[in-house]
Amino acid sequence: MKKYITLLIAFSFLTSCSYKEDNTFEQKASNRTTSVIESYKNILEGHDGYWVLSYYPGVTRSFGGFPAAPRSLGGYTFVVKFKDGKVTASSEISNTNAEEESYYTYSITEGPTISFDTYNSILDHFRFVSAVFTNARGGDIEFIFLKEENGVITLRGRTSNNLMTLTKLTGDREALLNKLRENTQALNSKGLNPI
C-alpha cells in the first residue's frame, strides 16, 4: 500500500509541473524592436525642419581628478535634417554654412541605433584619422536611441559612450551657426579657447 501511495504522490508532482511560462510582453522581441525603430524614424523624418545635435566627441574623460562626466568636456553643434534615408548636415566646426548630404540607416545593436553609413566631411570630422590625430578624436557615427521626452531625443554614442541630444531647431539654421562662430571668436580674442 505504501508503494501505491508513494507512486501516486510522485505522479501528482510530475503532473503539477508545467514548463510553460506566461509571456511577459504581448509582442515578440523582433516585433517590439521593429516598432521602436519605426517610432523613432517617424519622429525624425516626420519633422520637416532641422534638428540640433549636441555632439560630445572623445572618450569619456575626467577633469581635475573628478570622475568622468557623461558628456565628456565640451561639445559641438551639428544641424541635421533627416529624409528618406538621407541626412543633410552642417556645423559650427565648418568655416561656412554649407550643407553636406550622406546616407543613414536604422539597426539594432545594443538598442535601436541610427548609423551614418557614408562619408560626410561634417559628420565624420571627429572620426577622421590624420598624422596629428592617429586615433581620430573619439567621434561617433553610430548613436543608440535612449529615450524621447518632450521633443528631445537622447542618444548615446557607441564609440565614446557619451550622451548627446537631438532637439528641434526653432530658429534659422544659418543664424544659429553664425552666432556660434561669433561666440567662439569672442572667446578666442579674450585668450580663452572654447572647449
Residue ranges and their predicted role:
Residues 144-148, 155-195:
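Ser/Thr/Gly/Pro-rich, low-complexity flexible regions
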Residues 19-103, 107, 111, 173-190:
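Acidic/polar, low-complexity intrinsically disordered N-terminal segments immediately downstream
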Residues 47-59, 122-154:
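Cys-His-centered catalytic/binding microenvironment captured across papain-like cysteine peptidases
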Residues 13-16:
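C-terminal motif of bacterial Sec signal peptides marking the signal peptidase cleavage site
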Residues 89, 114-116, 151-157:
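Generic recognition of long tandem-repeat/solenoid scaffolds
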Residues 2-7:
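Sec-dependent signal peptide recognition
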Residues 90-141:
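Contiguous, well-ordered beta-strand patches that form the walls/edges
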Residues 58-64, 97, 122-127, 160-166:
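Short, surface-exposed beta-strand/loop "edge" segments at domain boundaries and coil↔beta transitions
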